[in-house]
Amino acid sequence: TFALFLIAWVTGARWADNEGYLEKYNMELVWGRSFLMWRTDWGKNFIEKVSKKTIFWQRVGDVWVVTVFLIMIFMFLLLVWQATLAWQIPKSASVSPKMMIGLPGLNPVIPLWYGILALVIAMVVHEFSHGILSRVANVKVKALGLLMFFFPVGAFVEPDEEEMKSMKKWERMRLYAAGPGSNMVIAIIFSFLFSSVMVASLEPSSDGVLSASVVLDYGGEEAGLEPWMLITEVNDQVISNSEDFSNVMNETYAGQVVNVSVLNRGNPEEYQVTLSDKGSYYLKYYPDTYENWMSGKGFMGIAVVNPEIVADSLANPSSSGGSMLQYITLPFQKLQPFPEHFTALFTPTGLVGVIPDSIFWILANSFYWIFWLNLMVGLTNALPAVPLDGGFIFADGVTGMLGKVKSSMTAQRKEEIVDRLVSILAITVLFLIIWQIVGPRLVGTEPVTLNADIDASITKGWSTEVFEFDASGSEGAFVTYEWDFGDGNTAVGEKVEHNWSQGGLYFVVLTAKDAEDRQSVAFQEISI
């Protein structure tokens, strides 16, 4: 489909160019006669009017220069840090090149129509800001324009190049910083609208507790329960929150069959779940948190959370680093645009509650994507790599510093040093970006099989009777075997022996570790 679209676009554009239709509208084909560039005077009058508030824009430009410099440092250090992670990422989890392209329709994470809307706004804001700061510095704007490949993929403001060369360095830095700086402002505004206006108005549509995750091969998953279901009843007992769920589950026992009522995308459904043993689960996966009372208790294999906590974390993303990271990565969690299983959980209230639900969710999604793409455009353009804005800002900044530190140096020598530094930095940034794609494929980790296993000579016996335990059947390159016998005694070794002085039910826990301290846990129930 994409290939047919590509052929149709290129063929149609070249036909229109050959027939002279593009020239009539100040259009031309560039980059292999495949991309359409449109130059226009539209918008010049707006730029002229807005730029008359010279002092205001100069002060704003000063703030943007400082802000972009800080973002530049942060982004470069982030790329360096990400480069070091290549050795820890599984080869199978390598980033697809498509994920590095911020264009809707090509990047699978960015939805087409929300993406086009947000990208157009980001480009218009970015380029108009360049134009405004050009006029503030009395630099002529020759033209404005769009670069299109069926839909807009770029925009530009074309200042007079000769006048730009004669600008003071700080004024030119303001001009370049205006693009990413204005994108960050728009990102902040629409983040506020999304979080503090739209999401903050959400309230749970029904009482219940949200299924946050489902453990494979346990009762809930085997019965058909899935994440994002709202659990409303367990064994005919009403569940209003996570505390109710815990209290009800603590009254159940392993092997019990319970009825679970849920709302799935707003539709009521019933499930019968055979409960597993809670103690066994914790011994296998979280032995450090295991307590004796857990053994024999029912375990559904469902992690739950109150729905309002989900909405609160999105309404207040700055409350913690984890919330902010979750907020920015919503598209990768398949939570933006909001899916049906999310919208069914909440109802808009307050002033925005008068908006029809369908329009409310469209607005909320639009606000998020305008925030997200402006943030990405701003952060990317702040990178210290020509032809990005950050690269030009870095060049002027270094030139200014050399002028103060090495005032005796000739202008030609300064230019040579700056050009060399800028080239090295641009190549470094490009390498770091490409390394995110190819690095894990070259040096990433291979799949590792780790499966601890206990072979017990007997599982039932008398006090003082000797039990033998053998871990040689474990899968993996283990180097240490640590045993906990549940009575306060421990041992180390592939094969061990133990006897208990008192009767009771014990769980023997084996923690097997490899040379890199990766571990696998196994347990065995022993009756004395």
Segments from the language model and where they lie:
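Small-residue-rich helix-interface/hinge motifs
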Residues: 2-55, 73, 79-165, 373-402
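Cytosolic juxtamembrane amphipathic/interface segments immediately preceding
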Residues: 43-60, 162-175, 408-414
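Functional transmembrane alpha-helices
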Residues: 86-110, 264-379, 393-429, 437-446
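Extracellular/lumenal mature domains of secreted and surface-exposed proteins
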Residues: 446-528
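Internal alpha-helical transmembrane segments
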Residues: 112-156, 163-208, 366, 420-425
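Conserved PDZ fold ligand-binding element
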Residues: 221-244
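Alpha-helical transmembrane signal-anchor/signal-peptide segments
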Residues: 20-22, 199-219, 443-449
